[in-house]
């Protein structure tokens, strides 16, 4: 079954010296292909050269990102949520445009695999570094050990754009970031 969802968020207001004026739009859809499922999403939020005056969500104001994306390095995402860039949909007030896709493959009844790709661009220049945050590729496997008990492992690679290397993120002066992750979790 094909599914489509999305949202439109319109923010207006101030908290202390910070404004959160702006809007965001997300469209997401998925379609089965045999036993596999292909999903994609596009998101755009407005920003400001002064991130204290740009679009922010409640998560952004609380310095959290929420699980909203498919990627592992640029965004918080389940088993890799340890040392990611923590992009929330407002990109800290700079605004964000991203296009992402994933493929979910059931290998057996208890084992599944997922591969993903995502492209990220800041709505406004991040300092003097421009807008290109980068592109990410990754994948993971998930094994159901018992009912609600899962073992997950994966890896991800991000090619950083100039804006992705700034101190607003990890302050990494590298052209890429690599990550290997795993999680053993009881889900209920």
Each PLM stretch: what is its role?
Residues 1-4, 35-39, 109-115, 143-153:
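Repeated loop/turn-to-beta-strand initiation elements of outer-membrane beta-barrel proteins
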Residues 8-14, 33, 42-48, 117-123, ...:
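Transmembrane beta-strands of outer-membrane beta-barrel pores
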Residues 12-102, 166-168:
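Extracellular/periplasmic loop regions
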Residues 20-24, 96-98, 134-138, 177-181:
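Transmembrane beta-barrel architecture of outer-membrane proteins
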Residues 27-31, 40, 101-105, 139-143, ...:
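Residues on the lipid-exposed face of transmembrane beta-strands in outer-membrane beta-barrel proteins
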Residues 148-173:
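C-terminal beta-signal and adjacent terminal beta-strands/loops
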Residues 174-188:
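Outer-membrane beta-barrel "beta-signal"
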């Amino acid at each position: 079954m094909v599914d489509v969802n999305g949202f439109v968020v319109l923010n207006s207001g101030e908290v202390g010296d910070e404004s959160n004026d702006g809007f965001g739009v997300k469209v997401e859809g998925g379609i089965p292909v045999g036993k596999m499922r292909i999903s994609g999403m596009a998101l755009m939020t407005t920003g400001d050269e002064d991130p204290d005056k740009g679009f922010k969500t409640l998560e952004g104001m609380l310095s959290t990102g929420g699980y909203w994306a498919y990627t592992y390095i640029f965004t918080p995402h389940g088993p890799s949520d340890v040392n990611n860039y923590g992009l929330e949909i407002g990109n800290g007030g700079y605004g964000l445009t991203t296009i992402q896709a994933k493929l979910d493959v059931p290998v057996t009844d208890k084992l599944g695999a997922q591969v993903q790709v995502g492209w990220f661009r800041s709505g406004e220049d991040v300092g003097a570094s421009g807008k290109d945050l980068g592109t990410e590729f990754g994948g993971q496997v998930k094994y159901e050990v018992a009912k609600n008990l899962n073992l997950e492992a994966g890896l991800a690679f991000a090619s950083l754009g100039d804006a992705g290397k700034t101190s607003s993120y990890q302050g990494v002066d590298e052209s890429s970031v690599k990550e290997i992750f795993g999680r053993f979790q009881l889900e209920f």
